[in-house]
């Protein structure tokens, strides 16, 4: 707070919720979540950046202790505190305490095979956990095409993550032992000491919609190229907005840090009088997993088939990460998708341990 105030002259108010906006009066009603005190602030220009909270479906037992969603740093801290309650210096061993046996927490179930699910799975493996990952679809990392995702799934399996595809969690139960049980649509059950939900995010548009701002078909706040909403004095940036996909030209929800950073800078430029515009995003992303990486940009072959696009071709390449006459080179699997009629690059995906 002090850094923002001293260096940037920004009045940063933590523990404060914006509860409503009045575009007509150009005011925002605020509430201190600790004291309940309510205040009103006026604005000339307003920027909304509410983000996209984790999806938490109304499943039986989803609010049980030990079942977590993870999206923010405080979320991660809560999970770490929960894990450390039952580990201690005797992790991996049972110990007798009073009239009960205290068993370290060593079993984890991850629900969801996207960014968050895979990164949490890796970290729990490093902590010595037995990890089960449940994915509703037929592959992890849905932006990848299936043949590329299969490589990722094999790599996860090689490092101890048990990947369960085409299944989904339908409920959670606390057992007499104190452990949790994850119940799935297939009828399979998984015992767990901790359950992490990583089943996606949804744009937070409640405040914007209540203020009468337009929301798109995909559920995000609609903005123009200068990040202005349907009210020219209210801007919106980040995971809560719909943006143009640079390759397809269609509206998309792209919850990535890179585009959000650029959108914030463009909104600031426009407010300051500079004619800046957001050209769209390619959805470029990368994820590390057990010393390797998976990356993608543009559209996948799967996307093109869903769009009914036939004018494309693909090529697979397997170069080394560096010149073969230097030691330590490892192969990189690359898939490139391009338009046949003019050779325009439409998308690319890459997997490898180096390079």
What are the functions of these language-model segments?
Residues 63-95, 178-183, 188-266, 270:
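FAD-site-proximal beta/loop scaffold in flavoenzymes
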Residues 28, 33, 46, 193-196, ...:
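AMP-binding/adenylate-forming core of the ANL superfamily
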Residues 1-10, 22-25, 37, 48, ...:
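Glycine-rich flavin
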């Amino acid at each position: 707070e002090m850094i923002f105030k001293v260096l940037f002259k920004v009045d940063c108010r933590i523990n404060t919720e914006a509860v409503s906006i009045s575009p007509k009066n150009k005011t925002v009603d605020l509430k201190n979540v600790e004291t309940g005190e309510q205040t009103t602030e006026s604005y000339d220009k307003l920027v909304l950046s509410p983000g996209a909270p984790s999806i938490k479906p109304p499943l039986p037992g989803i609010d049980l202790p030990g079942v977590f969603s993870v999206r923010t740093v405080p979320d991660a801290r809560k999970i770490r505190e929960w894990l450390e309650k039952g580990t201690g210096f005797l992790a991996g061993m049972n110990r007798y305490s009073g009239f009960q046996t205290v068993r370290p927490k060593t079993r984890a179930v991850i629900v969801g095979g996207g960014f968050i699910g895979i990164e949490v799975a890796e970290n729990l493996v490093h902590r010595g956990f037995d990890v089960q990952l449940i994915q509703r679809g037929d592959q992890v990392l849905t932006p990848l095409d299936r043949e590329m995702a299969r490589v990722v799934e094999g790599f996860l399996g090689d490092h101890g993550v048990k990947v369960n595809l085409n299944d989904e969690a339908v409920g959670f139960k606390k057992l007499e032992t104190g452990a949790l049980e994850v119940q799935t649509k297939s009828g399979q059950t998984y015992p767990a000491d901790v359950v992490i939900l990583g089943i996606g995010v949804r744009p937070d548009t409640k405040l914007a919609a209540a203020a009468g701002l337009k929301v798109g078909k995909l559920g995000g706040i609609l903005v123009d190229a200068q990040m202005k909403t349907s009210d020219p004095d209210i801007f919106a940036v980040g995971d809560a907005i719909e943006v143009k996909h640079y390759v397809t030209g269609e509206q998309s929800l792209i919850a990535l840090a890179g585009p959000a950073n650029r959108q914030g800078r463009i909104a600031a430029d426009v407010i300051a009088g500079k004619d800046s515009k957001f050209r769209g995003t390619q959805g470029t992303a990368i994820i590390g997993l057990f010393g390797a990486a998976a990356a993608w940009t543009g559209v996948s072959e799967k996307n093109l088939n869903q769009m009914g696009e036939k004018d494309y071709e693909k090529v697979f390449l397997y170069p080394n990460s560096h010149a073969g006459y230097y030691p330590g080179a490892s192969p990189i699997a690359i898939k490139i998708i391009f338009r046949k009629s003019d050779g325009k690059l439409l998308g690319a995906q890459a997997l490898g341990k180096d390079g």
